[in-house]
């Protein structure tokens, strides 16, 4: 059950709309601000896909949706919000302007999460003159309404209490919060993806394989292993009865071989862009983006549902969380009164802690 009653979403693109969908489908009221005149239509399209996926997850009926309001200003959107998620484009100057306005108008005890995929929170906090201590990075993965991972990163001015409250908030809407121990650009997930992306660009550019062949190598091979065990546990099993030490002794030396070009970046010229875009068009076989999104969502639900039945019915990995989340949604759907009142009761029992500025040390 969520510990927030009203949320605000600043930015309604793919990620922002995904946050809106997850929050609304958990019965939480959301006020959104996005200057794009097409924002309402785009959010509506994402909501259609999210509702469809959630109906598969909870066939017995979904909770009463939260109310969605389109605000005319950031100030209007964040008024009375317990939780604010910023999802504007990845430009530091824009982040500064938006966060400064959020900070000026949001309640002092509201947690502010940023969806940035690479900017350090310390670099964003400088724009927040009132309460920089309540800003955390809350980096999700697309589609936000289905993929549970959220990377939480604190900056130099972030209070530890803010990180703890952020963890509770994200967990309450069915997510898997992972706190990154040290502040670093691009955090963890995107750093791994960038390394694979760079090497993939070289493989396509050099004609080693096509984009479809590369994707097949991932989805028919190690991608299936990663989805349920990650990287290190897969390698532990690959080491046999001797485990990880044997694996590292056997395969560690190959890291010295010059197999990859991970530190080099191919020139992103028109020729490479055209090559990849053309092959990607061929790979789609005429399917639209919306059709591909539907296939993606159906597959994700099926994978998580399958994993939820493993480990003697307790669920495994993302499946264990999926099992608990679908139970939570079903329980919320069966509850009376409506979800917003239930969230208010939860908030009253465990309020979001109000941030306090550290006391200045006395001179002398």
From Swiss-Prot:
Keyword Oxidoreductase: yes
Compartmental location: Cytoplasm
Biased composition (Basic residues): 348-364
Entry keyword set: Cytoplasm, NAD, Oxidoreductase
SUPFAM superfamilies found in the cross-reference section: 6-phosphogluconate dehydrogenase C-terminal domain-like (SSF48179), NAD(P)-binding Rossmann-fold domains (SSF51735)
Primary location group: cytoplasm
GO cellular component, one term: cytoplasm
Pfam families: 3HCDH, 3HCDH_N
Enzyme class: oxidoreductase
Binding site for NAD(+): 11-16
Key word Coiled coil present: no
Highest rank taxon of the organism: Bacteria
GO molecular function: carnitine 3-dehydrogenase activity; NAD+ binding
Region of interest (Disordered), residue spans: 336-364
EC number: 1.1.1.108
Stored InterPro entries: 3-OHacyl-CoA_DH_NAD-bd, 3HC_DH_C, 6-PGluconate_DH-like_C_sf, 6PGD_dom2, L-carnitine_dehydrogenase, NAD(P)-bd_dom_sf
GO process annotations (BP): carnitine metabolic process; catabolic process; fatty acid metabolic process
Pathway: Amine and polyamine metabolism; carnitine metabolism
Catalysed reaction, written as an equation: carnitine + NAD(+) = 3-dehydrocarnitine + NADH + H(+)
Role: Catalyzes the NAD(+)-dependent oxidation of L-carnitine to 3-dehydrocarnitine.
UniProt similarity note: Belongs to the 3-hydroxyacyl-CoA dehydrogenase family. L-carnitine dehydrogenase subfamily.
Subunit details: Homodimer.
Identification of the protein by name: L-carnitine dehydrogenase
Originating species: Mesorhizobium japonicum (strain LMG 29417 / CECT 9101 / MAFF 303099)
